[in-house]
Amino acid sequence: MNEKQRLEQTGQIKTESHPADRKSALDRLKEKTTKDYEKYFTSVFLPPNLKEAKKRGKEEVKYVKDFSIPEEFRGMGRGRKFYIRTYGCQMNEHDTEVMAGIFMALGYEPTDRPEEANVILLNTCAIRENAENKVFGELGYLKPLKTTNPDLLLGVCGCMSQEESVVKKILKQYQYVDLIFGTHNIHRLPYILHEAYMSKEMVVEVWSKEGDVVENLPKVRKGKIKAWVNIMYGCDKFCTYCIVPYTRGKERSRRPEDIIQEVRQLAAQGYKEITLLGQNVNAYGKDFTDIQYGLGDLMDELRKIDIARIRFTTSHPRDFDDRLIEVLAKRGNLVEHIHLPVQSGSTEILKMMGRKYTREEYLELVRKIKAAIPDVALTTDIIVGFPNETDEQFEETLSLYREVEFDSAYTFIYSPREGTPAANMKDNVPMEVKKERLKRLNDLVQEIAAKKMKQYEGQVVEVLVEGESKTNPDVLAGYTRKNKLVHFVGPKSLIGQLVNVRITQAKTWTLTGELVNEAIEVNEHGKIYAG
């Protein structure tokens, strides 16, 4: 949806009100019918709708390549500061980089102190209830700031904003929030801020259906060593427990030439590692109608670029094809680490989850990957306590984990998400049982992780040095190609460089070693050698 279409759809009408006469957005909704409520907001009120979000439109996704800050908004932030708190996944981290870029293009300055900010945004995650509770707690914590500084703009954005229940709760319980916007219209941040400054009411703009693919958005990247690169948006899998297809929209792929150009620019700027992002990253290109081009093809082109490491996340087993495996086996700057969420080891539970693969199909995929990349590091996600999960089905998860021998796993107790099919399933697994299963799984995860890490002792590994250790400023920290955290003593000048480290001690989640030689360099052919 472009700006013209948005205005045509909404028929935006603005009214002014005296602060003393203000009524909450929820009060106005109760007073007026659904048909005419829009005109009672200074800005157009577009709440999310889960039913609309599930519809996958046939209209062509528009590619907007000419994003720019409107002249009338330049200087809006002069003398003002912004603060963004980010919850959740790497996609949210990247969205924050984009919003920070827009803020700074508007003239705002960043601050890491909420009490100094003129605009505070909470970029939220909806994947689990615990993540949402943290955001509501933070909103309560920020209320005194809003009370003492009425001119402060307080906003909620990200995935939680795409949920009907969340927006209704904010309208009812957190009426001091000034603006709510979702994941599809980040590029409209200048307009939303302008409306919030001009209005006397809460600004709510959440598109239930996906927006355009907007290129050339400004970004303020975190650091100069590693960078996120979005290659696609949305997910069409609709796993029964997952809210993401509703909050992020249908699958939309960026054009390969735009991605390749961005990666080349990052390489020219000196970045050492990029991570390709997508909710279902290996579905990349399946929405193209004019070319046959998938993630394997993209990776095959990116591996020729002079950058040390390329990763991707998160992949779905169903879309992990032979072409991608073939390209990853070429290695070079394509790392030997794959995150491959399995969620359960039981075919029956996988069917209830709507994962669209069986235990046997997942194990066959793992066999293919290991045959092509024998030293690959596989990590995964697992949910325990899914509705109706039996002891036998949980044991199947444990046995699959033992068979694959994952390097590590993100493990969770099932968290029902309102609006998803699984939320309507009868949950007959007691919480005590869920917790006991999680403990048993985590014990196994740690056992296998410790065994795999022990194998590194005496080995020399390539480490990308990211900075000082969080616990000791005299120690440097970085990650291997397989995403293992390594600590070693060395000069600060090595930060941002690739070095060789001999591992002297292995713990469950970290490695300790000693510097072997100077920084590793990457030549013009993308080949790595020790200097």
From Swiss-Prot:
SUPFAM superfamilies: Radical SAM enzymes. Signal peptide: none annotated. GO terms for cellular component: cytosol. Keywords: 4Fe-4S, Cytoplasm, Iron, Iron-sulfur, Metal-binding, S-adenosyl-L-methionine, Transferase, tRNA processing. It is an enzyme of class 2 (transferase). InterPro entries: Elp3/MiaA/NifB-like_rSAM, Methylthiotransferase, Methylthiotransferase_CS, Methylthiotransferase_N, Methylthiotransferase_N_sf, MiaB_methiolase, rSAM, rSAM_horseshoe. It catalyses: N(6)-dimethylallyladenosine(37) in tRNA + (sulfur carrier)-SH + AH2 + 2 S-adenosyl-L-methionine = 2-methylsulfanyl-N(6)-dimethylallyladenosine(37) in tRNA + (sulfur carrier)-H + 5'-deoxyadenosine + L-methionine + A + S-adenosyl-L-homocysteine + 2 H(+). Pfam families: Radical_SAM, TRAM, UPF0004. GO terms for molecular function: 4 iron, 4 sulfur cluster binding; metal ion binding; N6-isopentenyladenosine methylthiotransferase activity. Residues 80-198 form the MTTase N-terminal domain. Its main location: cytoplasm. Its cofactor is [4Fe-4S] cluster. [4Fe-4S] cluster 2 binds at C235, C239, C242. [4Fe-4S] cluster 1 binds at C89, C125, C159. Catalyzes the methylthiolation of N6-(dimethylallyl)adenosine (i(6)A), leading to the formation of 2-methylthio-N6-(dimethylallyl)adenosine (ms(2)i(6)A) at position 37 in tRNAs that read codons beginning with uridine. Belongs to the methylthiotransferase family. MiaB subfamily. This is tRNA-2-methylthio-N(6)-dimethylallyladenosine synthase. It comes from Geobacillus kaustophilus (strain HTA426). The gene is miaB.
